[in-house]
């Protein structure tokens, strides 16, 4: 019976494609502004292990967001007098310039430029901080890329005020995925599914969704205890896995 209902539901579910995330001409211009977002890290109950081309997961994953582990990003933006040929941004982590993060942000911006065509029209000052050590296995890249994607979507929402809230979240997840796969699961909580699965008609490889079915009460008070034994970087990433 449940599978039959899922089959019927699948017929009315519209799954967004990459083309849906291309931006129309913007009706509004914005010279400068500021956006602040706090995004949670997440811990996978079912982990993806390895990715295909274009940040597509090798298998679906299911995760909980972590209420006490988060990244806060403040993004200030100012329109340039002339559109640049390169991305123009300054990056600070915990109040200090962080040049070692620049290549990853550059790669992220290159991947998403086709979906956010305004990126080379602005100078960005990006300030980010974590409530936990980065690169130690607590998915700081997930919360960091999610927070940055949300800030960039804030700017696009300013340029396109008619944007629907549901589309805002889906595109933020879509963009975050292109920065770090698990980042697409950090846009909202609490139980999140990423990756196409035949038993979940709304699921897709392009962005994460809330787990769409009833969750047992025992999982609504689920706890994750983090014990730090070393603050160094983990040796094996999910991408390599």
Regions from the language model: what does each represent?
Residues 5-136, 150-161, 165:
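ATP-binding N-lobe of GHMP and related small-molecule kinases
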Residues 126, 134-186, 190-193:
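Long, hydrophobic, well-ordered secondary-structure blocks that form the structural core
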Residues 164, 168-241:
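ATP-dependent small-molecule kinase catalytic core of the GHMP/sugar-kinase superfamily
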């Amino acid at each position: 019976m449940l599978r039959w209902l899922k089959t019927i539901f699948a017929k009315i579910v519209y799954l967004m494609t990459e083309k849906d995330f291309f931006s129309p001409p913007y009706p509004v211009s914005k010279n400068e502004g500021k956006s602040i977002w706090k995004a949670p890290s997440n811990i996978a109950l079912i982990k993806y292990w390895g990715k295909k081309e274009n940040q597509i997961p090798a298998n679906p994953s299911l995760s909980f967001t972590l209420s006490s582990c988060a990244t806060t990003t403040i993004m200030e933006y100012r329109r340039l007098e002339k559109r640049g040929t390169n991305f123009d941004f300054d990056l600070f982590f915990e109040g200090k310039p962080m040049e070692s993060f620049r290549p990853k942000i550059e790669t992220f911006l290159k991947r998403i430029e086709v979906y956010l065509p305004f990126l080379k029209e602005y100078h960005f000052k990006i300030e980010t901080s974590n409530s936990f050590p980065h690169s130690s296995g607590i998915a700081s890249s997930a919360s960091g890329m999610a927070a940055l994607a949300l800030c960039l979507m804030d700017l696009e929402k300013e340029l396109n005020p008619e944007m629907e809230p549901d589309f805002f979240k889906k595109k933020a997840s879509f963009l975050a995925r292109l920065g770090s796969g698990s980042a697409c699961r950090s846009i909202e909580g609490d139980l999140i599914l990423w990756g196409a699965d035949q038993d979940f008609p709304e699921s897709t490889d392009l962005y994460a969704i809330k787990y769409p079915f009833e969750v047992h009460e025992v999982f609504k008070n689920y706890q994750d205890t983090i014990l730090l034994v070393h603050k160094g970087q983990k040796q094996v990433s999910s991408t390599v896995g």
